[in-house]
């Protein structure tokens, strides 16, 4: 069973027939990669996955969320939203792949639209948090952002219920692994004799990735 583990997996959190896992394969692009999936155990092995959504969050946004978690601000926000019945997301990340890129990858949608992916962190009614990922049709606006056009009917939907501790483990383990990766990067620069003042993000990611940045939301989405 150990051989089946994704070598890039940092940590995985399971809920009922779904999970989210944090992966380390996008650190070089200054992104944290969260893979969401649902599954049906009644189906044959190899065909059990029913939804799959990849969400990429910028490292600065991840670190800011970890700061809120560590200082207690996130717990305070959660408690206030529960008391007032506020159902608005604590945080939301927008991403996707444009229709042009989909055509380049040979993955054009039948409707000709872009592929939108959205991730939301909300306060749950029966648990502390819900970490939700949705995907479906979208349109690219004048700023190049992929705007979702699926309303409340996404083509793929994964909602992972999490306790405060579970979310803490997911975020802080990801932060710790990124910091370890960053330390290793600096050491590699020292040993190679290179002198650089900053970590260079890969401005030209592999073709299977598509990036989008917003005013307060930033993510990149993986093609599959």
Where are these regions (language model features)?
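An N-terminus-focused feature that recognizes amino-terminal "leader" regions
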Residues: 1-27, 210, 217-223
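A short, structured beta-strand/loop element
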Residues: 25-44, 130-143
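DNA replication sliding-clamp ring fold and its partner-interaction surfaces
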Residues: 54-81, 161-187
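Mixed-charge, glycine-accented linear interaction segment located at domain edges/termini
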Residues: 137-224
